[in-house]
Amino acid sequence: MECPNCHKNASRVIDSRPSDENRAIRRRRECENCGFRFTTFERVERSPLLVIKNDGTREAFNRDKILHGVMMAAQKRPISSEQLDTLVDHVENEIRKQGLNEISSKDIGNLVMKELANLDDVAYIRFASIYRQFKDVSGFMEAMEDMMAKHDKE
């Protein structure tokens, strides 16, 4: 595997262990050229999944887009990157469980919001404000009321 430091193709595995609830293998590698250590992950290749965007176009599912969105929503919140990665895993697993080849971006957004609501209220509201494209304060207030109603039920 290519070293991210010196770009030589000479590395060796120095540690290997299950990761992501046994859905991946985490490998710690060391470059034989420069000694730089880095981590790689091995995951099962899954069948392609297409996302139907709001304008009707389709694109390949990209978990990194979801991760980026939740990272932005969780900025300066007490949420670890591991928690965000787990959230994205839950969303992706939920999508895959449905056995579909295509899913709308709206459905993905709803799954993300459901997961965020269980993780952090502020991150949920931040994500909702972009995902739902609030036009004014009333849309924001509706999201806040939804969150408060959820807490009242608990």
UniProtKB/Swiss-Prot annotation:
One of its GO terms (biological process) is negative regulation of DNA-templated transcription. Keywords: ATP-binding, DNA-binding, Metal-binding, Nucleotide-binding, Repressor, Transcription, Transcription regulation, Zinc, Zinc-finger. GO terms for molecular function: ATP binding; DNA binding; zinc ion binding. Residues 1-22 are annotated as: Disordered. The keyword Hydrolase does not apply. HAMAP family: NrdR. Negatively regulates transcription of bacterial ribonucleotide reductase nrd genes and operons by binding to NrdR-boxes. Belongs to the NrdR family. This is Transcriptional repressor NrdR.
